[in-house]
Amino acid sequence: MPAPPAPTEEQMAEMAQTAMQLGLPAGTIKISECVPTMGEHWARPQDLPLGPIYGVKDGKLVFVELMPSQEMFAKGMSWVDALKTPKWFLKINHVDIEFQPQGHEGYPIPHYDIHAYFVPHEEHLGYCLPPQ
């Protein structure tokens, strides 16, 4: 799959403004459009693939994600304050932990997707669904 075109200066400025409004770290950019049941994914490129990755829907922060590899867990690695939210007062509603034995696009090795959601499950499961 070919890489998407680099964002324009105007798009970069818009992303910087959105990231600042959400309280995300400087240099955070949108890395995907709206993913069904999750929302847009935002991150600092240097933090990938582990994360943190931030989920945004309609201008609202809805999750923080980490993707530690299976090897990292096997080595006994720890992550302290890894899911600290940029707006620390957001209350985590629930956490989804999924093992990806084959990986997925963007991270094709066995790993865990750990999403700490700030919205109810019923809400994010309705995000960006394809037309039926």
Regions found by a protein language model. Name each.
Residues 1-132:
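Metal-centered catalytic cores of metalloenzymes
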